Every structure is written in structure tokens, then in C-alpha cells.
A protein has these predicted regions:
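Vicinal oxygen chelate
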Residues: 1-5, 27-83, 92-118, 129-131
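Conserved active-site tyrosine of GNAT-family acetyltransferases
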Residues: 16-21, 95, 122
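Conserved catalytic-loop position in the HRD/HxD motif
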Residues: 87
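Conserved beta-strand-loop-alpha-helix junction that forms the acyl-donor binding cleft
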Residues: 10-13
Length: 131
């Protein structure tokens, strides 16, 4: 068993695609229209294009429990997911220059450094550098 696709709820797929590709640096992998306001839209890490895909899932728009869950996590300051990086400080500075808003600046936590940012699509995302 292995991870192929992980779903991340987003409020607007087009906005999410722009943020996840142009700002974060992911690459669009699959884009299949399913209905008027819904696509099977995935992105992958540029360095690992055959690796796990992130499905930019518009569920908060048509499935109330997803919207409630997404909102509750964000209001509690809990990241929806995390991405690993090789150098957290460099990534933090790069994203700051692109206008990304961080709720937690780079912070040591035991064997890792973390930072948390707003993905502009309804989620907090945690960056992690393993030390």
C-alpha cells in the first residue's frame, strides 16, 4: 500500500491552482472537468512528479461538513497538512517575498523546525525541516 493522492479542501480551484503552482512551486499533474464547478485537479512536487498528488478538492463549496471542518481547523490555528522542506529559513524568506502570510514564523520544536502559513484557499499549511 502507498499514498497516491491526498485531498486538500479549497474554496476556489482556480485560485488554489495559481497559489500552489506559482507561489509554492508545485506542478499541475491532472486537470479533468467533472461538472460546471468541479474538476479532478491535482498538483505534485516539481522534484517528484511521479510522487504523491495533492487533489485540490472544492468540497467546502458543496459539502457543508467539509466547510465546517476546514473553518474549525483554521480558526483553531491547526494546519490542514504539512510539507517538508530542506531549508525552512530559505523557503520562509522566499514565500514572504511572494506575499505569503505566516501565522507562525520559523520555530524550533525538538527535532524539527516549523512554520505555518495561510494558503489563501481556506487552510493553514505547516512547513517542516527535519534537523
Amino acid at each position: 500500500m502507498k499514498i497516491k493522492v491526498i485531498s486538500t479542501p479549497v474554496q476556489n480551484q482556480e485560485k488554489a491552482l495559481a497559489f500552489y503552482t506559482k507561489t509554492l512551486g508545485f506542478v499541475k499533474k491532472i486537470d479533468i472537468p467533472l461538472s460546471e464547478n468541479n474538476r479532478w485537479l491535482t498538483v505534485v512536487a516539481k522534484e517528484e512528479q511521479d510522487g504523491p498528488e495533492i487533489l485540490l478538492e472544492p468540497s467546502p463549496n458543496h459539502f457543508k461538513p467539509s466547510k465546517v471542518y476546514q473553518k474549525a481547523l483554521k480558526e483553531a490555528g491547526i494546519p490542514y497538512t504539512q510539507f517538508n522542506v530542506n531549508n525552512l529559513q530559505n523557503e520562509y524568506e522566499r514565500l514572504l517575498k511572494l506575499g505569503v502570510v505566516f501565522s507562525i514564523e520559523p520555530t524550533h520544536m525538538g527535532t524539527v523546525k516549523i512554520a505555518v502559513f495561510n494558503d489563501t484557499c481556506g487552510n493553514l499549511i505547516q512547513l517542516v525541516e527535519e534537523l
